[in-house]
Amino acid sequence: MESLTLQPIARVDGTINLPGSKSVSNRALLLAALAHGKTVLTNLLDSDDVRHMLNALTALGLSYTLSADRTRCEIIGNGGPLHAEGALELFLGNAGTAMRPLAAALCLDSNDIVLTGEPRMKERPIGHLVDALRLGGAKITYLEQENYPPLRLQGGFTGGNVDVDGSVSSQFLTALLMTAPLAPEDTVIRIKGDLVSKPYIDITLNLMKTFGVEIENQHYQQFVVKGGQSYQSPGTYLVEGDASSASYFLAAAAIKGGTVKVTGIGRNSMQGDIRFADVLEKMGATICWGDDYISCTRGELNAIDMDMNHIPDAAMTIATAALFAKGTTTLRNIYNWRVKETDRLFAMATELRKVGAEVEEGHDYIRITPPEKLNFAEIATYNDHRMAMCFSLVALSDTPVTILDPKCTAKTFPDYFEQLARISQAA
C-alpha cells in the first residue's frame, strides 16, 4: 500500500484558496440538471464524489462541458425530472452526496434504474430514505441487503404525506426536499427523531431558493412543498469553498501558527462547518472573520466538552487537535460518524490510541486525553479522506507520522498534502 511520511512541522503560515464545497457542488449539479436553462457552475470541486455525479448525469443523457481543470461546468438543464431510455445501472462509488439525492430524484419518472457503488456504500444505510419515498408512491427494490444499496428504482413518486427519520443522516431529508417540488402533488415531509446536521439542510434550502424554489420550513419539524414546480437556472453560480476542508488548515494554525488564512468562505457562508472556527476560538486560538476569508492565529489550546452534532465532519478535526490541548476533550452527539465513509468513531479511537492518546469510545461520543509526547505511528485511513487529513496534524508535533493510502483525499481534496506543505516550515 502507498504511504506518505510527514516530517515534523515547526510552523505554518500562509493563505489557502479552498477547493469548492463537496456538499454544494453535488447539490448544484443535480439542481442544474433538473432546471430549465443553462447553468454555469464555477469553483466546482474536482473530486471523486463530483466525478461520480457527473458520470451519472452523462449516463442519464445530460450534456455539459467542463474546463480543463474541471472546476467550471456548463450544464444544459433537462427542464424537469431525469429520464433514462431503457434499463440503466449507475455506479456511484462511495459518494453519499450522489447516492441519496439521485435515489430520490430518479423516482420521479417511469425509469428502471439500478444504483450501486463500492463495498462500503453497500454498508451505508439508506432504509429511512427508501421508506419515505415509498410513502410517496415510489417503487423501490433492495437488490442485496434490506435497507442498503444497491437499489432498483422504478419511478412512482407523486408526493403526499411523507415521514422521514432525521436521526441518522440529513442527506435523506435533503434528497426528499430537492425532489418534492417536481412531484405532481404537494408533499408534506414530517421529521421523526432529532434532525442531525441541521446546517446541511440550510445548504439545501439555500440552493433550492437560488434555483427558484421556496418551501415552507416549520421549525425543521415539518416541511411543506408545493408540487408541480420547476427549477430555473440562476445563470452563473459560484460554489463556495469547502468549509470542512478549511478545518485542517485553521486547526494547524491554532496548533503551530503563525497565521493561516483560508479564502472562499467567510462570515456569510451558508455552510455550517464554518462554526468550526468558533470551536477553535473556544479552545484558545484567535479567529478573524472576513466576507470571503477566515484566519486563525495560534493560541494556548485547552480541552473542550461540546455537542458536535451541528458540525459532524469538521468535528473530526477537533479530535486530532485535542492531541495538542491541555486536558481531556469530549465530543458528544456524534453517532452519525458511524455511518459515514467508514465507522469514524471506531477508526478515530483506534488511530488516536496508536499515537499515544488515552481514548474512551462511546456509542455517540469520544473522549480524548493527550499523551505527554506523541508516538510515531502508521495511520490507517480506512479509505476515508477525512481520516487522512485529520491525522496529518500529528506532524505538528516533534514526531513524524506516516499516512497509509494518502490518495484517499481525492474524495474531496486531491492536492491536500501539497497545499499543507506549501504553508509548512520543517522543524
Swiss-Prot record:
It comes from the Bacteria. Keywords: Amino-acid biosynthesis, Aromatic amino acid biosynthesis, Cytoplasm, Transferase. Phosphoenolpyruvate binds at residues 22, 96, 124, 171, 344, 386, 411. Disulfide bonds: none annotated. It catalyses: 3-phosphoshikimate + phosphoenolpyruvate = 5-O-(1-carboxyvinyl)-3-phosphoshikimate + phosphate. It is an enzyme of class 2 (transferase). Pfam families: EPSP_synthase. GO terms for biological process: amino acid biosynthetic process; aromatic amino acid family biosynthetic process; chorismate biosynthetic process. One of its GO terms (cellular component) is cytoplasm. It is found in: Cytoplasm. Belongs to the EPSP synthase family. This is 3-phosphoshikimate 1-carboxyvinyltransferase. The gene is aroA.
